[in-house]
A protein has these predicted regions:
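Catalytic domains of carbohydrate-active enzymes, especially glycoside hydrolases
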Residues: 352-375, 471-476, 554, 628-632
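Glycine-rich, aromatic-flanked loop segments that form ligand/cofactor-binding clefts
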Residues: 365-370, 396-443, 478-479
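Short coil-to-beta transitions that initiate beta-strands within beta-rich domains
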Residues: 30, 42, 57-72, 102-127, ...
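Aromatic-lined carbohydrate-recognition surfaces of secreted/lumenal glycan-active proteins
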Residues: 412-420, 478-481, 504-541, 596-607
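Substrate-binding cleft of secreted/luminal carbohydrate-active enzymes
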Residues: 552-566, 575-582, 588-652
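Conserved Ser/Thr-centered positions that define the repeating blades of beta-propeller domains
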Residues: 46-50, 88-90, 126, 143-144, ...
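Conserved beta-propeller blade signature
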Residues: 34-38, 76-78, 87, 131-133, ...
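Active-site-adjacent "subsite" loops/lids of carbohydrate-active enzymes
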Residues: 332-346, 418-471
Length: 652
């Protein structure tokens, strides 16, 4: 009998332990006992108890990408994502609640695509936690009921050009950080840029781009701002002028400030490298005592960002870590490629000389024009529309591809996309961008003819050409002029095929590339302006590097040093300027593309506005690619004459 009593007692004890454990687990899942809440790519949200990370993704979609995690004064959590919307989780909730509005939806012409625009900035009104503010890149929204309903904020003089990257609220004023326009003060009556003293890069004369404002805070009637790429912090006491704060920077190429939060007389600043504390009395920075505790919780898998719960010693803190590996260069067959461009004039007159340079210097990729700058197709493809346009040339492209493949060369087809003279002129200019003033086909530069990217026919035609090109044996399709026009009277452009007025230009480019990736059996890539590797311009010409990187295997920023403005990076000598421009272009483009696609920069191999032109100019560009974190690059010479590359590489 005593033995039986012991068994029953043991069962009761086990049951009690189990119930207690479930209670503790439930409390943990509600966020009560977690010290930190982190995002692990591919695994979701987890909570850290002090010894382990536990799942906390209940209610979240499967493959979301977190952008920001924040807590209000009551412990309610808010999670913003790249394309899955925004979620909320109060202390009493056992799962995340979707509080996204249909207003946040991505505008698309594709069937079966149902997702949200990236939430690029978020803030809670510190005086009223029911008031929430967020940005979907170029548009601001407000909720006055903790996210149950949302309304668009009308911004005077915005015109969808601002790309919002951070937000702070003080009374009736919204302070918004942007990708390249600096800091904007927004009220219902005015929109003002307050940029005297913030970090800038000058282009020509006084024309400049401001560094991306990655964080902003309004504390005790002062504004504090943090920046990307080692540009530190600024402070303003009058909301007009800015002074530099001496924030220690460990990595000048990539370190960014992502959170500025007050606690008593201390301001906590989290960068991608370190958590700092700034004493507002003695004006000194020091590494936070929390840093070593945080590092003990980190693992090889993450987290890449986390929220530190508030305590008696610190406020709630958001931390973003730059720890994701840029692995795609080594893990993909399209990575680690060093290419030369060859023009048809070179193929027809001295292809043997080109091949000698290619093989001697151990390049492993070649770019060849298929659909050229005028819409001519240099390949015997099958296309009813192309035949009607009379643009097909019967070249020996298959023999060229075969010869290159025999030497193990990766062969890339360059297809010019929306700049297409022959399609522009065909069918009575049916598919041309229109001039809303003259009521005729729009003309920018006289030698450039642009088709309307909003036209499904135009997009389908270019995808058809790419699919046919792939059948010839190419290894990759590279889309060039994958953008809207930049030169000429662009304010007169009328897009007759645009279905909705609030479509971002980047969204129609995304539609084209997402469809192309689904329909083309080989890797696809795009060329973008060099400045779009530096800043997230987004809606200006449609080349949003972060958004488009989701749909392509490789991106070619055109970072020719000669094409950056005469005032750009003049703090460096003429000799060092090519290296620094390419190095920082490499680091920035890898960062902005979220390390999910190969960055294969176009670099310069012809003498244009290059005072230090020569072999050293060539080699400094290559070193810039590598020192910026890249491995891949492509040399551009309009004729395909790479004799200077040959001289440079032979001298190494």
């Amino acid at each position: 009998m005593p033995f039986l009593y012991s068994i029953e007692l043991f069962k009761k004890i086990l049951l009690g332990i189990l119930i207690f454990s479930l209670v503790i687990l439930a409390a943990s899942c509600k966020g009560r006992s977690f010290l930190y809440i982190g995002f692990f790519p591919g695994e979701g949200i987890k909570g850290y108890t002090g010894s382990s990370w536990n799942n906390m993704s209940q209610g979240l979609p499967k493959d979301f990408e977190a952008e920001y995690i924040i807590s209000d004064n009551d412990g309610t959590l808010y999670l913003t994502t790249e394309y899955s919307g925004i979620f909320k989780r109060s202390v009493s909730d056992s799962k995340w609640i979707d509080i996204s509005s249909p207003l946040f939806k991505r505008r698309t012409q594709l069937d079966g695509v149902d997702e949200y625009r990236s939430i690029s900035a978020f803030a809670i009104d510190p005086s009223d936690n029911s008031k929430l503010y967020l940005a979907t890149k170029h548009v601001l929204y407000k909720s006055s009921d903790s996210g149950r309903t949302w309304n668009k904020i009308n911004i005077l003089d915005n015109k969808n050009s601002y790309y919002f990257t951070s937000l702070a609220v003080a009374g009736d004023t919204i302070y918004a950080g942007t990708s390249f326009n600096g800091i904007v003060s927004i009220t219902k009556d005015s929109t003002k840029e307050i940029n005297d003293g913030i970090p800038k890069e000058y282009y020509v004369g006084k024309f400049h781009f401001c560094e991306e404002v990655s964080s902003i805070a309004h504390i005790n009637n002062r504004l504090y701002t943090g920046y990307l790429f080692g540009r530190g912090m600024r402070e303003s006491s009058d909301q007009k002028n800015w002074s530099v704060l001496d924030l220690p920077i460990k990595n000048e190429k990539t370190e960014g400030v992502y959170s500025i939060t007050t606690f008593n007389d201390t301001i906590f600043i989290s960068t991608t490298e370190t958590l700092y504390e700034y004493n507002t009395v003695n004006k000194r920075f020091e590494v936070s005592g929390l840093q070593s505790k945080l590092e003990k919780s980190y693992s090889d898998k993450g987290p890449t960002m986390l929220l530190v719960n508030a305590s008696e010693k610190n406020p709630s803190l958001f931390i973003k870590r730059n720890v994701t590996e840029y692995a795609v260069e080594e893990s993909s067959k399209w990575g680690n490629k060093q290419a030369l461009y060859v023009a048809w004039v070179m193929i027809e007159t001295n292809f043997k000389g080109f091949m000698d340079i290619l093989l001697k210097n151990k390049f492993n990729a070649v770019v060849i024009d298929v659909k050229d700058d005028f819409g001519i197709i240099n390949a015997p493809i099958e296309s009813k529309t192309a035949r009607e346009l009379g643009v097909i040339k019967n070249t020996n492209i298959k023999d060229i591809i075969k010869q290159l493949h025999e030497h193990g060369i990766y062969v890339i087809a360059r297809n010019v996309t929306f700049k297409d003279k022959r399609l522009y002129e065909a069918y009575n200019n049916k598919y041309a961008i229109w001039d809303k003033i003259s009521d005729r086909a729009w003309v920018g530069l006289p030698w450039e003819k642009w088709c309307d990217p909003y036209s499904k026919f135009v997009r389908d035609y270019n995808i058809e050409i790419a699919k046919e090109t792939a059948k010839l044996g190419f290894d990759e399709i590279q889309f060039d002029y994958i953008r809207f026009p930049t030169d000429g009277p662009t304010g007169r452009c009328k897009y007759r095929y645009r279905e909705k007025d609030d479509v971002f230009k980047s969204e129609i480019m995304g539609d084209f590339l997402q469809q192309a990736r689904q329909e083309i059996d080989i890797p696809i890539s795009i060329d973008i302006y060099g400045y779009n590797a530096w800043y997230r311009f987004g809606n200006l010409i449609g080349q949003d590097i972060q958004f488009l990187s989701r749909f392509v295997h490789a991106i070619y920023p055109m970072v020719y040093p000669s094409h950056f403005g005469v005032s750009f990076y003049t703090r460096y000598s003429e000799a060092e300027r090519p290296y620094m421009i390419v190095r920082d272009s490499s680091a920035r483009s890898i960062y902005h593309s979220k390390k999910r696609t190969v960055i294969r920069q176009w670099i310069q191999d012809w003498n244009y506005n290059s005072p230090t032109w020569g072999p050293d100019y060539i080699l400094k560009q290559v070193n810039g690619v590598i020192d910026g974190g890249g491995k891949s690059y492509s040399f551009w010479n309009p004729r395909g004459d790479h004799s200077m590359v040959n001289r440079a590489f032979s001298s190494r």
